[in-house]
């Protein structure tokens, strides 16, 4: 939906009035196109107390392992994204973009913390989340030693856009959400998806 208002038909403007076409509300359009703020929501989940069943994704063994592997990727991945963005933070002059970067870093830090807690619990249940976490840390460490900063920033932008797209699919699919019958897992993933959708390029 366009933010530009539809004005009633009038006689053709003359003089100074002709400079601004009817319906061309520049200020409204600018406001609509300005980036939304990235808000840091300080969440805290408690998987130890609230995940009972071993196959927590609606009793589905395969999907439960898929989620555990994805969760294992997140903490080190989020830290990598933060370092990639932070490297360029001091070069930013735009105050709006600076606020967005600060919000992005804050969100990613909390994502990593909450998924580490979930990974610890899933590992105690027999999942390989922490093994995936260690492998991810090693792999990204090699990447950071070999790849230049602008490449890492490009990777961050691409992966954030990809995960934001997946997040929007999850948020719009009631059937997919219903698979996470354990409330704590569903709440964590939905919160993460909502915030990831704010990072879309």
Regions from the language model: what does each represent?
Residues 2-8, 16, 24-201:
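Non-heme di-metal
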Residues 12, 18-19:
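Acidic, Ala/Val/Gly-enriched low-complexity intrinsically disordered segments
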